[in-house]
Amino acid sequence: MATPSKKTSTPSPQPSKRALPRDPSSEVPSKRKNSAPQLPLLQSSGPFVEGSIVRISMENFLTYDICEVSPGPHLNMIVGANGTGKSSIVCAICLGLAGKPAFMGRADKVGFFVKRGCSRGMVEIELFRASGNLVITREIDVAKNQSFWFINKKSTTQKIVEEKVAALNIQVGNLCQFLPQDKVGEFAKLSKIELLEATEKSIGPPEMHKYHCELKNLREKEKQLETSCKEKTEYLQKMVQRNERYKQDVERFYERKRHLDLIEMLEAKRPWVEYENVRQEYEEVKLVRDRVKEEVRKLKEGQIPVTCRIEEMENERHNLEARIKEKATDIKEASQKCKQKQDVIERKDKHIEELQQALIVKQNEELDRQRRIGNTRKMIEDLQNELKTTENCENLQPQIDAITNDLRRIQDEKALCEGEIIDKRRERETLEKEKKSVDDHIVRFDNLMNQKEDKLRQRFRDTYDAVLWLRNNRDKFKQRVCEPIMLTINMKDNKNAKYIENHIPSNDLRAFVFESQEDMEVFLKEVRDNKKLRVNAVIAPKSSYADKAPSRSLNELKQYGFFSYLRELFDAPDPVMSYLCCQYHIHEVPVGTEKTRERIERVIQETRLKQIYTAEEKYVVKTSFYSNKVISSNTSLKVAQFLTVTVDLEQRRHLEEQLKEIHRKLQAVDSGLIALRETSKHLEHKDNELRQKKKELLERKTKKRQLEQKISSKLGSLKLMEQDTCNLEEEERKASTKIKEINVQKAKLVTELTNLIKICTSLHIQKVDLILQNTTVISEKNKLESDYMAASSQLRLTEQHFIELDENRQRLLQKCKELMKRARQVCNLGAEQTLPQEYQTQVPTIPNGHNSSLPMVFQDLPNTLDEIDALLTEERSRASCFTGLNPTIVQEYTKREEEIEQLTEELKGKKVELDQYRENISQVKERWLNPLKELVEKINEKFSNFFSSMQCAGEVDLHTENEEDYDKYGIRIRVKFRSSTQLHELTPHHQSGGERSVSTMLYLMALQELNRCPFRVVDEINQGMDPINERRVFEMVVNTACKENTSQYFFITPKLLQNLPYSEKMTVLFVYNGPHMLEPNTWNLKAFQRRRRRITFTQPS
């Protein structure tokens, strides 16, 4: 857990805390970038090949603060002691070119590659392209564990970066091209098949791996077809043999079968005849519909000139109506004057009528008064007679008072009863609300529990089935049995569920917890042995650990960011909690925060805790048995899956008890309501009886008083009527005088009115003349409009007729389709299936454009529905005469015959398909295998030469046990390092580590001269080699990687032998570190060279 020291090296134009210098003796001239933020892309077309790495920049990456590496175009040897940061450059190449973090074998999250204590890091790779260099930048955010990508300083996505990298044939995930330090051992573990695939992708043409994959798919389908053909052939032979045994019995059935076949053909033809009848009707309707459509078009064209003429007549009508309106205005004025005179005359007439009417009214009033006086006298006489006959009224008031008191008492009782009913109703409503609230709470609890059980059922079905069995059989156990731990645990805060799930293995999370060994044996015998369910069971400790105190107080740990022990994060039954404390020490494992992770080194050193949880990681701390050093490892926490749902079972039981109490109270309230309603009903009945008695007594008491009041009232009315008299003769004289005066005034007004009528008549004559002209115009216009309306009506009728015909056509078309579908179903034809030509007699056209056909045998059958129905009846009668035959045998025989025919056809089709697959395989195999053999032969030649130069033997061949199993093809590497042994296949176990490293290196060098990739990376491949082999391998690497037109090569090593041969084309990059290194901005390469030369020159010879 020690923090890496700052690394420095030779000067670099860009300031940095760590940089890689060039060896002055082997430095290849190149243009270096200055420190400006916007850097121009390198456009050099020197010895670099397309896709080679020109520059690598890192900021806050692993051990580096800031570093820039400028590799050469050929062999780049990166040298440095272990831990200086050589492999960090390899990681930068991988991650910078969109490689997966897990491929490096160091961490599975990209955030772990950022230098500790930094929140962001950056890797930038510049790749050579003739059209302009490609600069790929990857910025890493530690908090989000997220990357941000840029191409030539422009934001982009990882997918586009991967496409750009793939276009340059760069495969950072291929061990034949990119072999990091942690993957060197895995190369030897590659199977022959994996090695072939990696080699194809690395140096083969692009289509080679595609052909190989296509061959594997074709071969797999060929095997399936071969197996299918073999199975169908064997089954077909069995079916034929079985039918031969029943042939004699079936022949006796043929006569009956002939009739049944004819019935079947008749039933099959019947829907075709129905279809043909409807189709002919459809064709007839379609012809009529087309004729009507043409008629509609002609009617619409004929209406255009009529419309124009109507508009002309309308304009003329407007002019005449304007003149008529002027005359009407003059007439209106004259008529108004006439009206005024006439109104005055009418008022005079009305006045005379009113005088006459007033006189008549007075006459009628006098007659009515005399009649009313007579009627009143007779009524008084009748009332007096009735009063005499009425008996003296007895004293009824005491009885009325007694009934009134009884009514008041009953009303009080009713009010009291109604109040109690209202109280009961309110009490019941309150209880119902409480019941609904409790029911809702229980439903929510059940939903949460169902969620947990659904997760258990989906992931561990056997455990779920065992839970159901346990719930139905708890009586078989003597002591308490807890359901699986994941169901009984309830998190206090769901966000902490990840700590529990990462701490307790899933096998124990789904385990049942028992308090008794005997109970557990009963359970396992029933569930595991009898029901064959795979379940886990554990026993809780006899003495409870649930309340055991931790070894140190949480207050001591809060300074490091710890907020709780695991035990305090959840609730569980005592047996479960006791088991977890005993088995997993959850009372001793603290949970911290991000603050804990930031101080993790201090926490580990000072607390000596064995297990620690931070916000997102788990740390396991151990002490070395030999060196007593503290060793820690950390893993990222997995997301919680099971414990995020929390159910409080104790609270649910409390709610169920509460619900039972509410039900009991509701029953008591309902009983009280029934009794109160009966009491209220009885009181209501008694109240009605008393009111009726009181009403009868009051009527008897008030009758005499009413008669006396009526007689007194009538006598007063009679006196008033006798006093109200009228003089009719005087009234008649006054009315006659007033009428004469009014008639004189009326005669004068009539003369004035006559003169005004003459003027008005003249104006009317002039207006009538204009109206006649307008009428002529309107008549002509109306005639045109009538013709237009008639034509429009005819058009609407024709259009309606067209719509009806079109709807009928659609209906018939749909019916045709339905009949055709039914007919095809009867003939067992699919939607797109047609009958063979030899069974067709005619091809009627279906309205939807498809064609169908009638079987040839139909032509010998009747062509009308009546004839078909008659023949069907006859044939059915004949078929029913055949008895005593076993239809089951015939059905089985026929079914087998059909299956035999179907299998024969299927077998033919399968064989044809199989031949096609074999032909395709042959073609693809030729395109794939021949180039592959040539490629492997070239690899073998290079590989053998390299081994021969080392006085060893090695060969590479294309290996397969069966030439047809294309998924089993592989590249086999066989090596021999001693003359006394035979060639042995390269495996992780047979050869030593150094021998595997030599073999791996030489194989990669063999690929180097054939490779299409722009660069190759090999990290610390020489570890474990003896000095002789290491020297030989190094010489071959230099010779191979420094040839003209070869791809770029990165060779990372922590050590070098003395007096190794070097090439002018290779680049040596040294990696230094240490607390006393100079800062990059103070490093001056030229000054260092000058001082070095002075020291060399001044040394005594």
From Swiss-Prot:
Residues 1-43 are annotated as: Disordered. ATP binds at residues 80-87. Its main location: nucleus. It comes from the Eukaryota. Residues 1-17 have a biased composition (Low complexity). Keywords: ATP-binding, Cell cycle, Cell division, Chromosome, Coiled coil, Disease variant, DNA damage, DNA recombination, DNA repair, Mitosis, Nucleotide-binding, Nucleus, Phosphoprotein, Telomere, Ubl conjugation. GO terms for cellular component: cell junction; chromosome, centromeric region; chromosome, telomeric region; cytoplasm; interchromatin granule; nuclear speck; nucleoplasm; nucleus. Sumoylated. Ubiquitinated. Residues 207-445, 647-828, 888-927 form a coiled coil. Changing residue 990 to D: In ATELS2; loss-of-function variant; unable to rescue microcephaly and aberrant craniofacial patterning in zebrafish lacking SMC5; does not relocalize efficiently to sites of laser irradiation-induced DNA damage; no effect on interaction with SLF2, SMC6 and NSMCE2. The modification Phosphoserine is found at residues 25, 35. The keyword Oxidoreductase does not apply. One of its GO terms (molecular function) is ATP hydrolysis activity. Disulfide bonds: none annotated. Widely expressed. Strongly expressed in testis. It is found in: Nucleus; Chromosome; Nucleus, PML body; Chromosome, Telomere. Core component of the SMC5-SMC6 complex, a complex involved in repair of DNA double-strand breaks by homologous recombination. The complex may promote sister chromatid homologous recombination by recruiting the SMC1-SMC3 cohesin complex to double-strand breaks. The complex is required for telomere maintenance via recombination in ALT (alternative lengthening of telomeres) cell lines and mediates sumoylation of shelterin complex (telosome) components which is proposed to lead to shelterin complex disassembly in ALT-associated PML bodies (APBs). Forms a heterodimer with SMC6. Component of the SMC5-SMC6 complex which consists at least of SMC5, SMC6, NSMCE2, NSMCE1, NSMCE4A or EID3 and NSMCE3. Interacts with NSMCE2. Interacts with SLF2; this interaction induces an association of the SLF1-SLF2 complex with the SMC5-SMC6 complex. Interacts with RAD18; this interaction is increased in a SLF1 or SLF2-dependent manner. Belongs to the SMC family. SMC5 subfamily. The flexible hinge domain, which separates the large intramolecular coiled coil regions, allows the heterotypic interaction with the corresponding domain of SMC6, forming a V-shaped heterodimer. This is Structural maintenance of chromosomes protein 5. It comes from Homo sapiens. The gene is SMC5.
